[in-house]
Each structure stands twice: as structure tokens, then as C-alpha cells.
Amino acid sequence: MYQDSEKNVVPREKLKKIFRFAALSFTTEKKCDTIELHLTSVGAYFCEHYARRAEAEENMYYEIENAELKVGVETKGAQLKSIRSKKTDTEYLWQGDEEFWKGRAYNLFPIVGRAYKNKYDYEGKTYETRPHGIARDNEFVLADRTATKLSFALTYTEATLKIYPCKFIFYVIYEIFGANLKVSYRVQNLEQKEIAFCLGGHPGFNVPFHPSGDFEDYFLEFSEKTAIKQCLTAPSKLISGEVVPFSLHANNRVPLTHDLFKDDAVIFANTCREVSLKRKRSKRYLTLRYPDFRYLGVWQTPNSQAPFVCLEPWTSLPATDGKRYDLFTKDDALHLAAESAYETAWTLELHE
């Protein structure tokens, strides 16, 4: 407990939040749980100043832009809200619609997809989680900002420890250069032991790119031919456990139809890790590059006429139907040594 200059009591949890915010304001490399501050008169000013700033940061929206792109991000979930071409004034990012999917571009951490019965194990204990983990529902702090770069950070709390029992800082970093948007994920392990986690992106794109045209005019095109596999889904929207060859059409293409998603996401493995979303008889398209991600999920709302498609780079798969996994021993989970950091990225490029 701490009293400010007006003798108002500052609750312990709020004080922790203030310190975390202040630490991230100073540097994105600080370990917030080790900062020690003497609450002198200077400390009183410090707390009040950053308390006001921390509260002001909730549910905020930030933009970055250059000559070609304008990108918007909100602090809840550090979620993309807009990817707009300044050249053609085209909004490429799905803008959310309750009828189909209200999200736009979730960041997935520390799990990808669904857990069996929304539960998973970690070091002998069972935890309950929403699909895609904790990042999507939590407020991030703006840790750093320039004209073309935004860095957001989520630090563990008592609430997150009840869902994912590890101390961490999860950074989501957006940077634009030319017609490219780079989305980086950085996980900082604050534990004195190894931790396990999964990562992924979930950006949705308007299809068609503009009001004219039909969904079926579009297709995916991989940059190289590989022996692509499809991880089949079960009616529960979990993985069935069956992996089958997937036959590409000519020129390494996958035609888009609404029927393609009747069983939920189409999950690809063994891709070349570069795919473009294109339209027939058009030179306008976008390219997703995901060099460190083993899987690509392609999704829209099943059994709908939804005018969007999500291209989702994943490090790991959702749960297999009927099986509750242990995250630490999951065969495709990422592992991070004590007090170390892991960083990866995917990149989006617009072609107009």
C-alpha cells in the first residue's frame, strides 16, 4: 500500500501496474519485476505522474505512416485495426463485423487455436484458456514509438498467471518500410527456469479488396512448389490428427471459395513460407512471408459468405480432438531458457 501526496491510498496491484508502465516507458529491455524504487517525495511524484499516464493508455489507438502505408493499432491485444494504402486509398485489413467475425488481427500467445475442452496442462497442473491464449484480451502498454514503428508490451499479472503460469513480457512490434509491414513478436522470459509457449498471427484481409468483385475471383499463390500437407480438422474445430497431401492447382495456387472453409480453418504444413493473395486479371495483390512459422492457417467464418480471409502464420498447432496436451512437452511448442528472449516476425507486402 502507498499513499500519494493527497493521502489517497494506491492499491498494491495498481502500484505494480504503474511501475511496469514506467519501466516500459524508460526501456523495452527492463525486467519490470526487479525494479526497486524508494517512495520518497520524488517517488510520490513518480507514482502520480505514471498513474495518470498508465490510465490514459487504456484502450488507445495509435498510427504510423510513411509515403505508401498508414497503419493503425489499438492497445487491447496490440491488435492491428487498419492497413491502408496511401497510393490507392485502399483498406486491406478486415474491419470486423459481428455477423461474421468481430476480430481483425489477433496476436496469439501462449497457445494457438483451441485447447481440448478449453484446458491444457503445464508442469502437472491444469489451466483453462480461451482460444488463442491471453494476449488478445489484455491491454498492452505502448513501450516505444517513432514515425514508422510502434512497440507494445504485455507483462504478466496475477490474472495471467492463473491462465499461463509463467512470468514474461510479450512484445508486439509494428514497423513499416516502403509498402511493407513487419510484425515482430518478442518473448522475454522473466523466470529462473525454461518456459514453453506458442506464437501466431491472425490477420484478416478484405476479399474483395474493394467493393467490386467476388470472393471467388481470388486465390492464394505460393512462391514455390513444395509437398504441402493439410492438417485436417475435426467437427470440434480441433485437429483430427490426420495429415494428408494437399494438391495445389496450376502455378502453385489455391482457389478461394466459401466451401473451402466448411470444416473451419484449412491448415497447411510444409509450405515454402511465402504466399500471396491475388485476384484474377489484376496486378494488385499482397504477399505474406513467415520464415520461422511451421504452419499457415487459412480461415474465414465457416458456412458463411464472409467477405474476408485470414492468413495466419503459426509456430504450433491447436489441440488434437479428445486429447488435452501438456504445453511444456507439446512437440511443436517453443522453449526459451531462463532469463532469455526469443524474437520472430512475419511480413506483409502490398503490390499495387
Segments the model singles out, each with a brief description of its role:
Residues 70-126:
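Acidic-aromatic substrate-binding/catalytic surfaces of carbohydrate-active enzymes
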Residues 73, 120, 124-128, 185, ...:
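Short Pro-Gly-centered flexible turn/kink motifs
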Residues 125-178:
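Extended, loop-rich substrate-binding clefts of extracytoplasmic carbohydrate-active enzymes
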Residues 127, 132, 137-144, 254-330:
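Acidic/His-leaning functional-site neighborhoods
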Residues 171-173, 331-336:
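Beta-strand-rich interaction surfaces with strong enrichment in secreted/lumenal proteins
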Residues 207, 211-290:
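Active-site/ligand-binding surface loops and adjacent short beta/alpha elements
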